[in-house]
Structures are given as structure tokens and as C-alpha cells.
Amino acid sequence: MGVFCRDLPLFLLSGRGMMTGKHKKGENDMDIQILQLIEGAKQARGLAVIIDVLRAFSLECYLTQRGAAELRPVRTLEEAFAWRQRDPSVLLVGERGGAKCEGFDYGNSPSTIPAEAVRGRRIIHSTSAGTQGLTQAVHADERITGSLVNAAAVAAYIRARNPETVSLVCMGNAGVREAPEDLLCAEYIRSLLLDRPLPDLEARTDALRLRGGRHFFDPDNQEVFPEADFWLCTKRDLFPFVLRATEDELGLRMEKVDLSDLCSAAAWGQAALRTEKVEV
């Protein structure tokens, strides 16, 4: 059980009381692009938000909150197994075609990985969409992940960084087919940056059950795509942090950045996050 953000305060999501000169499109502004799939990741510039709602980057938020010591995204299965050869204690997590990779400890499923399995562990994560985009967005100045569960935190982070260019990259299915949930997430983040409500947000989220998430409701698919994953991954604004990719001699490493770390209390004021207890 943890206490997480349910509704981020307005001062984090609007331009009021902040350095606002470049946040609105059309005003000597932040250029916000929505890109698609692996090719979009390769084209990403500026601050890149690599989006994979179902399920890679929703899962990484849950793993972080459950106490993972370190998250290392890798592109290939060979890289993942090489990690295990160097360090037998690592946990291998990921999928190909949605299913758990042979030889891995867990699949890409937030509902099936308990906190006790990940607490204090180094996790090597490889998927067919999300981690592919993250590792291939090499022309971006900075890379963070995005999903519905931390979308408002992503918008707040972007505002604090105030880059000239933002690339919202929708990774889709296997990085080659567009997915409505990733586009919805990108448009939601953009709407927060522009202070413009996204029309039909609730209805579009609900409609994912019949579109991008329909396989989570197939009784014959529950081993690979449990229904619980859909509900966990489509919660909005659950976590008040972002995951930023940094690089060291071992490769990419995801760094947790809490909203409270973005700037001082004097700059942001003393407003508190409204929270409620949420089971993760």
C-alpha cells in the first residue's frame, strides 16, 4: 500500500506563477510534436517523451513504486541475458509479442509482479515497443518515459525544464502499428502543456476497452494479457514522478525524478498534493 498523487495541483500544470514565456504554442514557444513508432523515436529531438501505455512504461512506474533498486532498459534479448551472465541476481522482465520472454523471470505485466519480488532488485527490462523506442531516440537531448499513470507529472516536468522542442513519441504495438492509448496519452500531455482541456478524455479512455485494450478482455488471453493490467495501466495521474533515462558505462538507467525535486518550495509555493491511498 502506498500514498500517491491522484490530482496534481493546478500550479504544477498551468503557467500561472511560473516561468511561462515559452509554454504556449504560437507565442515564441515550445514546439510540441507528436511522433509515431520506431521511426518517430529515431526522429525525436529536444526533450523526448517515449510513450507506451500498454504496458512497458506503466509497468516501470509500478516497479519503481514497489521498490526496485534500479531499472535498466535494453533493446535486445541478448543484452538482457548478458546482464544475467555478469550479475546472476538481476531480474529479467519483458516480452515479445506480449508474452513473457523464454528465460525471463516475469513478463510485462504490472498485475503479476509482486512488490516482494522487485524490492531492492536490479531489473533488466526489454519489450517489443517501449524499450525499443527509448534506446533508439538517440538524437534527443533528453529522454523520459510517459504513460497515463504519470502523465500529469510528465507535463509538470516538461514545464520545469522548458525545452524549445518536445517530442511525444507514441510507440504503438511492437513499434510498427499505431495504438490509440499511446496517442491519447500524448494528446493529454499536450493538452496539459497548452492549458487546453482535452475533449472527451473520459469517453476516449473508456473506449480503449474496445480498441487498443480489447485483448485484455479476451478470456483466452488472460495468461498473457490479464484484465487487471488494463485497469492498472489506464489509471490517470497516479504517480507524482517521472522516469528519466541516463547513460553510464553500463548502458541506459532509469532515474526517478520526484516533482518535489524539480524546484524549491519558494519557487512553487507550499501547495500540497491531494492524495489518497491506492493499492499497487
Question: Could you describe each region identified by the protein language model?
Answer:
Residues 39-41, 48-62:
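Short acidic, Gly/Ser-rich segments with clustered Asp/Glu that frequently serve as metal-coordination loops
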Residues 87, 105-142, 156, 161, ...:
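Long, charged alpha-helical interface segments
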Residues 32, 46-49, 70-71, 89-92, ...:
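Structural motif
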Residues 57-78, 84-91, 96:
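A short alpha/beta connector and helix-capping loop motif
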Residues 10-29:
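Short, Lys/Arg-enriched N-terminal segments with co-localized hydrophobic residues
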Residues 154, 164-178, 185-186:
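Hydrophobic, aromatic-enriched interface-forming segments
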